[in-house]
Amino acid sequence: MKETLSASKIKVLKSCSWQYWCKYILKLPDKTNSGALKGNIVHLIFECLGEERHLKHYKSIIKHKDALLCKPIARLIRKHVISKNLTETEDLEDICAMINKGLMYDFFGNQYGEPTQVISEKDFEIEVNDEDFKYKVKGFIDKLFLYKGISLILIRDFKTNKKMYEGKEISDNLQDYIYTLAIKKLYPEFKDVKMEFLFLKQDIPNEGVMTMENKNEHDLEGFQHELTEVQKYADKFDEKMSLSNLASNQGMPKDGSFSGKLLCGFATKPNEKKKDGNPKWYCTYKFPFDYYCVIDKNKKVKKSAFEKKDLKYLKLEEGDKIVKKKYEGCPAWNVKKDSDPFDLDSF
């Protein structure tokens, strides 16, 4: 199997063929917004406080209900806020609010009794190659609680995005299916697997906690058939297929999910502003841009970035070099006009 699947990779493949082509085949750079950067810091703090040696810091935050009143954690948060060029006012406040919510909601998984084992940042890669199913999938689980006495595993995933899931994002959630399937295969001795999402910008422990419907063997068997088909499609994906499922041709979503034409964004030009002065969001690959990439001796892209300085830290191997390239933009939004035979300026 050529490609290794993941929830995010499959979602992009299903959502927009051109975005998949740009991100995973051409390996173009992607914009990292402030929301994602803040989410990285929140996850880092949760991982740190999940360790037994940092229990006193966890207790300090719970006591004062403020992560910034625990000096070691406050220093760590501020260090990453500064390094990621986030603001020490609104962004810092937002990060601490999400941290407080995550810590105060059953952080050590005692809702089903004391766990036999707690695992933070569990990564996995599952490969199945038999008569019925052929797929390779990987993932990264924020928190895993194992309850041996009641034969239960609880998967918890922290979400730092503003909007909760709706429509197919709930009924056909790829992360839910993939994580549940993986844990069933990694821990076959456990009977039940539960999955929950914690939306840290919402009201927790109320609507901000989204518990997914349990998946039975029939559900997971059907999903493995789907994974097998996706694997075939991803392994043969080429430039011709990049135009086969453009988000711009899918219309607006009717189930409230962030999909279809919404994925393109409403900006008509790069860096366009709203009436209030804030930038309009749009897909990274909607408009043309220049970028830099590291290519090997066979001209294969190893890494790319918008700024050349962001590649300077890489250790280049023999035959590697950094080159500047130009991306022409999404074909749905950047149609090349035929040249004007009477345009003398083009000569």
Where would I find each of the regions flagged by the language model?
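RecB-family 4Fe-4S metal-dependent nuclease core
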Residues: 1-347
